[in-house]
Amino acid sequence: MIDISTLFSLNKINEKLTPITYIGDVKHSRVFESGRQLLNLLGFKVGVFTDKNLLPENKNDLEIYESWDEVFESSNAIELLRVQKERLQDNEEINFDEYINNYQLTQEILGKSQSDLAVLHPMPINIGIEISKDAIEDRKIKYKDQLSHAIPSRIAAFKYARDEI
């Protein structure tokens, strides 16, 4: 809800592009699943770009991308998700060196993206895993915008649930 509110405030929701592509551990992420459900209710598919071992079992209404170039061609916003080591099962193996090499957002990768890309992150951020140290301060990183929507979004949902709005 907070992420969708942030996307609306940044004018990132439109019919031409996938509203957001999630990058990282979508298999174990509650942020991904709730965002996916809400965007699907609004009539949108969401994108994912991740290691095959971190894809969700249900791939319906997903756009699965194979490269950063595909992500940038199809989405005007991305959300980085941390690998949730504590939720990995014994049979789920992740090679972190390979993961970082393929899926870490770096300044070099950001330089290839569109100038108005919005990069979200639900926090906590693992600098050096899902995002490099040099990329964290880029103007495209919008986690502070997300934080500014957190309380107002929750208040609105609470008031709506109580029929106050």
Predicted segments, located by residue:
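A glycine-rich, Thr/Ser-enriched phosphate-binding loop motif common to dinucleotide/cofactor-binding enzymes
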Residues: 1-6
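Broad structural signal for hydrophobic residues in well-ordered alpha-helices, predominantly aliphatic
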Residues: 7, 109-110, 157
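Short, low-complexity, polar/charged sequence segments that are solvent-exposed and flexible
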Residues: 7-9, 39-43, 98-100, 138-141, ...
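Glycine-rich phosphate/diphosphate-binding loop of Rossmann-like nucleotide-binding domains
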Residues: 8-81
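Conserved short-loop catalytic and cofactor-binding motifs
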Residues: 23, 27, 97-98, 145
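Donor-nucleotide binding loops and adjacent catalytic segments primarily
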Residues: 48, 55, 107, 144-148
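Rossmann-like adenosine-cofactor binding region
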Residues: 58-134
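Adenosine-phosphate binding glycine-rich loop
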Residues: 116-117, 122-165
